[in-house]
């Protein structure tokens, strides 16, 4: 069985050996991703799915590998438009980058809430949080038929009520 990006037994062996396992997004994954044509919520989803899989971190391969004219054309060779950057030259962000930051903040909220709910013995709330987070995987997308946007909105609603 696969756990998102690697075989479940490989991930378990790495965990047992104390090795760090991170997840990486680049142009190989067509969906969800952070391309200029991607739904903005997919940027948050890509980070959240690292938490769902129990990974130690997330890496987006590039944020500022600009094309020749990044303000006008985000295409680079045969790669999907926007794959090489999510911020622009100068003091310019993008919706894609801001949603990526949002996903990172959500991951920290999840970490803090898990600690607090465990300390308080709030098992029901912790189970609800963990169940909602666990869906944020490629398998969860196909099993639930929910979009990345729906999953991100659901976790936001929960994080803001716990």
Where is each model-derived feature located?
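Short amphipathic alpha-helical segments and helix-helix/interface helices
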Residues: 9-14, 46-47
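Extracytoplasmic/secreted cell-surface and envelope-processing proteins
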Residues: 7-11, 30-34, 67-70
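Short, small-residue-biased leader/transition segments that mark boundaries at the very start
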Residues: 1-6
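Catalytic domains of carbohydrate-active enzymes that cleave complex glycans
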Residues: 55, 71-162
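Extracellular protease catalytic domains of secreted zymogens
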Residues: 36-38, 53, 61-62, 69, ...
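Conserved, mostly hydrophobic/aromatic
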Residues: 50
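Active-site clefts of carbohydrate-active enzymes
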Residues: 16-45, 62
